[in-house]
Amino acid sequence: VQVGDIAYHVAAVARGARRALKIADLPFGADATPEQAHAAAVRFIQAGAAMVKLEGAGHKLEIIRYLVDREIPVCAHLGLTPQSVLRFGGFKVQGREEAAAAQLRADARAVAGAGAGLLVLEGVPAALAAALTAASPIPTIGIGAGAGCDGQVLVLHDLLGIDTGHRKPRF
């Protein structure tokens, strides 16, 4: 998916959903540098997004700071980050082992400290997600991360029990 494709769809959603918070996801590769991320984010904001989402921490902290310093609200995404699924060896819950949980705790503190205004936790054990939420100065949204987050993403196909050929989620 290209930046232009997302900007087009953000504009369509913005026309139909005027009061909803619209968050546009930076596609794979669009956040390779702070400048590239900024260029994409500006397009999304101009199209009607209120915030941009990017996956991960580490080197992404510089990008979060860069965007926030330029008045672009950022949503960070930790845990099972779909753009990194090949590195994870598939769609697997993240943070089960103590070392991985400690890294998620550090990453959650770091993205909030860098200026992210919202944190998505995906595929994280429920107890860890609840602990991250309790310690977080910013709201958390869970995707398959238990009921302890501040809000939830529910995928329509999961909610309706529509099988797309993949293993059904346990939540």
Predicted regions and their residues:
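Alpha/beta enzyme core
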Residues: V1-F171
